[in-house]
Amino acid sequence: MPIRVPDELPAVNFLREENVFVMTTSRASGQEIRPLKVLILNLMPKKIETENQFLRLLSNSPLQVDIQLLRIDSRESRNTPAEHLNNFYCNFEDIQDQNFDGLIVTGAPLGLVEFNDVAYWPQIKQVLEWSKDHVTSTLFVCWAVQAALNILYGIPKQTRTDKLSGVYEHHILHPHALLTRGFDDSFLAPHSRYADFPAALIRDYTDLEILAETEEGDAYLFASKDKRIAFVTGHPEYDAQTLAQEFFRDVEAGLDPDVPYNYFPHNDPQNTPRASWRSHGNLLFTNWLNYYVYQITPYDLRHMNPTLD
């Protein structure tokens, strides 16, 4: 699926070097087809890096995807140039009267922060409430899963004693589930979080269907039966080097982090890691776009909410 982005977005050249099909707005305007409108609420500090990761995964299908980047934190960013944010991101007020086929809410490094202490917690709640009437399907990633479970289901914050970091094995629970179509019975995915997601908690306090979990009973992928919301507790979008960058950052900060599990060859941080989760990550996003967005979204987005012109 060619992703449709502004001509000047840095990701255009970055992804083209990887032979990823990126369609600029100027070229897309010549195609008579309604693109899927996907809104990305980017909560990660290094926004350009995160853009590249998610856009890569949204690029593999024959339809256009029109990407809109959203920010809700008005504080000055220490990791992303203000010019980039001003040129490529919108505020909630800019899109609150629009409808979207899909919404992706990224993770955020807030695992040890109480929800009410998050600077933009009221804005998160506002976006999630808004999405019920304005978005066909929403995909929550890592910390956003924890936030959504609290806002939508009232589940208290669950925090691990030690950070979960590494590449872990998961198994699918329903072989014919659409979101895991094409997955191997067992697959690998990276995690980097303090948030805890016991599968038993999800089963006991929600009506969500768990689609994949670990042997230890940690939920990895779950969704609502109507396909309106889906949750992935890991980071399938991560590059091969992302966990290494986080590890060495924490080492330099004097935090004495554990070496990420099942990641560095021979468990030696001096060895170059290889991504073992790319195929599953691509399948997950392709399946979400196809079965949870494209297959159920109205052709005319105004029909999602008849009060909108």
UniProtKB/Swiss-Prot annotation:
The keyword ATP-binding does not apply. Its EC number is 2.3.1.46. Keywords: Acyltransferase, Amino-acid biosynthesis, Cytoplasm, Methionine biosynthesis, Transferase. The keyword Cytoplasm applies. CDD domains: GATase1_HTS. The record marks G111 as: Important for acyl-CoA specificity. Its main location: cytoplasm. SUPFAM superfamilies: Class I glutamine amidotransferase-like (SSF52317). The active site is at C142, H235, E237. It catalyses: L-homoserine + succinyl-CoA = O-succinyl-L-homoserine + CoA. It holds the Pfam family HTS. Substrate binds at K163, S192, R249. GO terms for molecular function: homoserine O-acetyltransferase activity; homoserine O-succinyltransferase activity. GO terms for cellular component: cytoplasm. Pathway: Amino-acid biosynthesis; L-methionine biosynthesis via de novo pathway; O-succinyl-L-homoserine from L-homoserine: step 1/1. Belongs to the MetA family. Homodimer. Transfers a succinyl group from succinyl-CoA to L-homoserine, forming succinyl-L-homoserine. This is Homoserine O-succinyltransferase. It comes from Escherichia coli (strain ATCC 8739 / DSM 1576 / NBRC 3972 / NCIMB 8545 / WDCM 00012 / Crooks). The gene is metAS.
